[in-house]
Structures are given as structure tokens and as C-alpha cells.
Amino acid sequence: MTHTKLLVWSCVSLALCVRAFAAAPTDIVIDDQKVFPESLGSTPDGTLYIGGSSTGRIYRAEPGQTRAETWISKESGDFHLVLGVLADPATNTLWVCDNDLDAKTATLKTFALKSGNKRKFYLFPGGGLCNDITLKAHAAYITDTINGRILKLAPGSGELSVWYNDPSDPSLDGIVWAKDGKLYTNTYDSNHLIRINVNPDGSAGKATVLSTDLPLYQPDALRLSTDGRILMIEGQGRPGAGLKEGRLDEVVIHGDSATIKVLKSGFELPAAVTPVGNIAWVLEAKFDYQRNDDLKGKDPGTFHAYAVPVP
């Protein structure tokens, strides 16, 4: 290749790289009002799926888009209070937690990931609050925040069963299987990070509340980065914190303790995180506009998911 051709090719390659980099959004706005989104999922190509807790809708932003638009309507999904959202490209499934608080009914719902068409719905035995979802070996594990339970949907099963139960420490929220083969969850109200061992038969074993080098406050979503590190959201980071002191953490486990590495703070009450490559998308929920008497009735503004590079 001549020097001239090499120079031309280098310039073309650089231009393409710059264009691709410029096209990658760092901020996605949900194209709706008063959404109060609680969870989001992703696929490796960068598509994001976001659940609107108050609107009862699933929003989708395809790769390169800067706005997430309604994809599954409230009517199509028969939604009420939408919480956990998890995308599973391997089975072309979108998992969604839906709750009817008046009827005390919680439902795990599945949809076709590509089309959004309904698949199967699974009621929580005895009611509860379907909060978040994780997968292992084609089984789904779901936190029940009200009752302190983790429910399991085994492959091929038509109903949910109780896999873990500790009513003394409810408010289970985030949930994830880590590379060590153990399940990790947390409690939003008691600020606990919990490791659950697994017995040889697959049942839940000993649960351990891990000590942390930094105090937790409003721990929420748990997800693995693409290289297998544990990512966690904290709504405010500390009691009495301002509106924009939520944070994204990396959790490093050492025996019965954990080191909390703050990757980025300054989010307005975030509730969820999902990885795409070396990016962690952090979703702001702004729940203070529903909970804080000084903010109720005021305009929360737009709702965003932000791209955070994970070093």
C-alpha cells in the first residue's frame, strides 16, 4: 500500500470512528411525562428497555437513539405498577414485574423481546410486590419486596415457587447472580447487602448480611458488568442527602465483607443500572417527587438514563 493510499485510508477510518463515537448517545430522555421509571434492561447491541412505574408503559430506545419512546402500552401489557425489567436475548424474552397495589396482586410477565407481543404471566403465590429479576440456567429469580421472599420460575414450570424467605428482613430489592455462583440481593429499607449460598440441590442455603466499608443507603438495582463485576445503585448514598446524591457503585466481595467503590455520584434518586459494553446506563427515578411533601405536585421535569463509562 502506498503512503498516499495509507494516508487516505487512515483518514477515512478516523472519520468513521469519530462519526461512530459522536453518534453514541450519553443521555437518553424518556419521551413522556411523570414517568418515574424504576428499572431498565438492555441487549448487547445497545437497545434499552425502560419501565415507567407510574405510566404503566415499557419504553424502548434503539441503538443511537436519544429518546426512549413507548413500545408496549399500558393497555397492551395490561400493566399497573411496572417495576423490574430484564431483557434476555438468548430466549428472545423481556421479563417485567407488574403490580396491582389495590388488589395486592403481583405478576411476573413475559413478552417477546423483538415484537413486544405477550407471552406468559405468572402470579405471585399469596400476593406480594414483584420488584426485580435475575436469570440463571434458564430459571428466573424474582424479589418480593413486601414479604422478604425470592421466588423462582424453573424452566418449563407454569408457576412460581418460594426459593428464599426471610420475613424478618423484608424490602428485598436488587438481585443478581455473581461469578462466584452465589446470589446477591439487598434491602432498600434496612440497607443490607446479602449473599445467599446455594445448596447442592439448587435450593437456597445460608444467607449472610455482608459488612461494607461504606454505609449503604437505599441500595437498589444490582447487575453484573459485561466483565462480571457487581454494579449497584444507591438512591441517595446517605440519610438526609440532597436530591442529586444518588450513586453508581462497584461492589467487591471479600469473604463476609464488601468494598464499595463509588464509580459516579450526583444522580437524582437513581433506581436502576444496566450494562452495554463498557458503559453502565444509570436510570434516574426521581421518586422524591412522589415521597417528599415539599416536592409532591411539582414538576419533576424530564427523566433520563445516563451513560457512565466503567473503568
Model-derived features: positions:
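A short beta-strand motif characteristic of beta-propeller blades
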Residues: 24-30, 67-76, 117-123, 159-166, ...
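Beta-rich, blade/repeat-based domains predominating
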Residues: 31-48, 76-98, 124-141, 166-183, ...
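Short loop/turn segments immediately following the C-termini of beta-strands
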Residues: 53, 99-101, 145-147, 155, ...
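Short loop/turn segments that connect beta-strands within beta-propeller blades
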Residues: 62-66, 112-117, 154-158, 197-202, ...
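Asp-box/WD-like beta-propeller blade repeats and closely related beta-sheet repeat scaffolds
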Residues: 104-137, 143
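Beta-propeller blade signature
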Residues: 108-114, 246-253, 297-311
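Blade-level signature of beta-propeller repeat domains, shared across WD40, Kelch, NHL, RCC1
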Residues: 274-311
